[in-house]
């Protein structure tokens, strides 16, 4: 990482801190600096991680569609940490890496199905201020996915909006997860808004 977060990380302490560090090392090989930032507010960290795990564990929506949707949010908002982490996660979960790699440039890429494009367009529309989801978008996805999967898609996009915007505001940048497993660089249509500036 070539920049500092806006709030300096603190040590993860106590029973909860020990559990978080153990889980992070098991899943990622190290403890992300972002966890040290959130450790300043353990109740918020616990709540955010809890809802994140629960939302991630839902299964009405196809896992590849879910991955594409949250990465489209991260790319649209400009969260380099979220893009890097979710690309790494797609690799580790055996999802379609070629498609995950192309998400930042999905409108120009030829690898996506029409359903995948509809999902990413919905994710981007939800991420606008104010949200720009249309009746037509919702109706098309309702027909293709069914109500439970559409509700799950909406919840996952909403949670990624919260996470992305929080990371950007706190100055939390990519920590090189995808690099650690030699994934090819993500496609790009230009610089990600919160890509770490050169020190």
Give a label for each model feature.
Residues 1-199:
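Hydrophobic alpha-helical segments
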């Amino acid at each position: 990482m070539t920049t500092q977060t806006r709030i300096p990380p603190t040590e993860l302490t106590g029973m909860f801190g020990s559990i978080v560090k153990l889980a992070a090392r098991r899943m990622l090989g190290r403890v992300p600096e972002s966890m040290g930032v959130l450790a300043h507010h353990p109740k918020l960290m616990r709540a955010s991680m809890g809802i994140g795990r629960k939302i991630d564990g839902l299964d009405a929506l196809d896992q590849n569609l879910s991955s594409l949707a949250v990465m489209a949010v991260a790319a649209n908002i400009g969260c380099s940490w979220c893009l890097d982490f979710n690309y790494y996660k797609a690799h580790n979960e055996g999802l379609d890496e070629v498609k995950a790699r192309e998400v930042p440039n999905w409108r120009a890429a030829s690898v996506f199905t029409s359903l995948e494009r509809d999902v990413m367009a919905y994710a981007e529309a939800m991420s606008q201020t104010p949200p720009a989801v249309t009746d037509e978008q919702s109706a098309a996805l309702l027909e293709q996915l069914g109500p439970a999967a559409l509700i799950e898609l909406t919840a996952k996009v909403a949670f990624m909006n919260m996470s992305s915007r929080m990371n950007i505001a706190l100055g939390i940048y990519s920590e090189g997860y995808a690099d650690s497993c030699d994934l090819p660089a993500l496609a790009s249509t230009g610089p990600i808004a919160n890509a770490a500036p050169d020190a």
